Regions:
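Carbohydrate-active catalytic/glycan-binding domains of CAZyme proteins
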Residues: 14-358
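Bacterial N-terminal signal peptides
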Residues: 2-13
Length: 358
């Protein structure tokens, strides 16, 4: 598998801006073999899939918001830093996490979280939600000059913007830090919350100590609509380090703002996990979802390769989370991954191109 992954990585690095890779019959994980946590996908108007990731090292430097693009979800071309200039209120910190880019009203909005400079002298200050804007999907994005919302610890992270096709409302999902996953309506400018709106709590943590409980911490919200249901994908419980224990889960609702029912509550399963550890892949999760040209759904997510779990040998805390891809299937109104975890060998490749929007 390493040999095939190396070939794919080489091909991805050689792609030019207008190149179209040959159609694939199979692929193998990983699809991007470098630290690329919390991947969030966007379908661009130029025929490319764009993906954005948490701050990470690349070619001897540190990228605040990582970005890459692909025509087929397998060959990825690195694009450098989508947020090359830090915001004025977070110019001296290094925590730029879990971006999501939303295309609306002729511009691209980058929702992300960052640690404010004030936190360097006041430990009670936690991460903030933020918004940056660009006229191109690859950036550069320019921060709006103020945080969207701040709070304690890391409860205000992992934003995902979503336009509800049923109501036309502009929504923002977010949450982590042992708190709930929430949603709140955005104002028409999409850079502030709608006047008078309040956050709605959708999912809550479960403090049980059972080994199969991944909801002691929940984060990484991603929403899609299918056959009259809104599916809220989320992850938990510990992404990183020597005690990493992480998986992707799902809940659903008839409304974008809930109430959501977890798969476990609906089916009686022991938990709501659709993607857990398998083989040499540890702590998979924080997924995004897209469709290929055949209309099949695909999960892009990060996982830790136990054969090379660290970005730096001396760093036992920050795991090397690389990007994987697997097909999402459906049964009885619920999504699942064929083997319950990351694929470990050649798999049928996505149909290159875009599927229908839902």
């Amino acid at each position: 598998m390493f040999a095939l992954a190396a070939v794919l990585a080489s091909l991805a690095g050689c792609m030019t801006a207008g190149s179209q890779p040959a159609a694939l019959s199979t692929y193998a994980n990983p699809v991007l073999d470098s630290d690329f946590p919390d991947p969030a996908i966007l379908r661009g108007p130029d025929g490319f899939f764009y993906v954005y990731a948490t701050q990470g090292p690349y070619e001897g430097g540190m990228l605040n918001i990582q970005a890459a693009r692909s025509r087929d979800l397998v060959h990825w071309q690195r694009l450098g830093d989508a947020l090359p200039v830090k915001p004025s209120w977070a110019s001296r910190t290094q925590d730029f996490w879990a971006p999501h880019v939303h295309h609306a009203d002729g511009r691209y909005l980058l929702y992300y979280s960052a640690k404010p400079d004030a936190a360097l002298t006041d430990p009670s200050r936690g991460l903030c939600l933020a918004v940056a804007v660009s006229d191109r999907p690859e950036g550069p994005f320019t921060d709006m000059g103020r945080p969207l919302q701040c709070g304690e610890s890391f409860i205000n992270i992992d934003p995902m913007a979503y336009d509800d096709p049923a109501t036309g409302r502009r929504l923002l999902y977010w949450g982590s830090g042992f708190g709930p996953i929430k949603v709140q309506e955005l104002a028409p400018d999409r850079t502030s919350f709608a006047p008078g709106s309040r956050p709605v709590e959708l999912l809550h943590v479960n403090s049980s100590d059972t080994p199969d409980n991944y909801q002691r911490l929940i984060e990484g919200a991603w929403v899609i609509r299918r056959d009259g249901y809104y599916y809220l994908f989320y992850s938990g419980d510990n992404c990183c380090g020597p005690n990493a224990h992480y998986a992707a889960m799902v809940a659903r609702s008839r409304s974008a703002t809930g109430p959501f029912e977890t798969m476990a509550a609906a089916t009686g399963a022991g938990n709501s996990v659709i993607l857990g550890a398998r083989g040499n892949w540890l702590a998979p999760g924080h997924n995004s979802v897209t469709e290929d040209a055949a209309g099949d759904h695909w999960l892009l997510y990060h996982a830790v390769d136990t054969r090379r779990p660290r970005t730096r040998a001396s760093d036992d805390i920050n795991s090397r989370r690389i990007m994987l891809l697997d097909r999402l299937r459906w049964r009885d109104g619920w999504p699942y991954v064929e083997v319950g975890g990351p694929s470990t060998g050649p798999e049928p490749a996505p149909a290159a191109g875009f599927g229908p929007r839902r």
